[in-house]
Amino acid sequence: MTRLRILLLTLVAALSIGAVAHAASFTTAKDNSALAQPTAAGAADFDMSFGLRENASDVVDETNTATAYANCDGCRAVAIAFQIVIVQRRPSTITPLNLALAVNERCSGCSALAVAHQFVVGKGEPARLTSRGRSQLLVVAADLLRIERTYRRLTNAQIESRTSAAAARVKTILAAELKPIDGSGDPGVTMTRRVDRAA
């Protein structure tokens, strides 16, 4: 378990109120996913997953998915997935996948929003994330987690705006705080964004 994962889990415990604990996850797994699926008429469901992992293998093929699925009456689904992949060598295959899927299946008066941001970082050499960078990412994760408390009062456009702002902050943090072990060079940050909506 990485130090960042431990800190994130501590953060979840500190911020947990009501449904927050089950509405978010933090992971170092290869496949990161968020799934929101309300099951009763008039219900709302929110899921957020924040992933951070290092990859020192010859293949970079991590997946990041956000799925919002609505199939009841007057319900709402919001799924947000963020994944950061720190590449620690020069791989021969780079095929990361970032997907967002929002589905409204025979749902009257329903709304579904899926947002996925994936960051692949590295210049083909070992790198380390500074303690300052870890702390800054914790703040971003906390801000994303707080969306769960207010999303019922937010429009989809407002949620998209907040996630876009969070993604911009993550990109800035990685560019500044991910340092090559030899102390030189730009780590390089590639970000993909996927958004899907259904109403």
Question: Residue ranges of each PLM-predicted region?
Answer:
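Bacterial N-terminal signal peptides
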Residues: 8-18
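Sec/Tat signal peptide C-region and signal peptidase I cleavage site
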Residues: 19-23
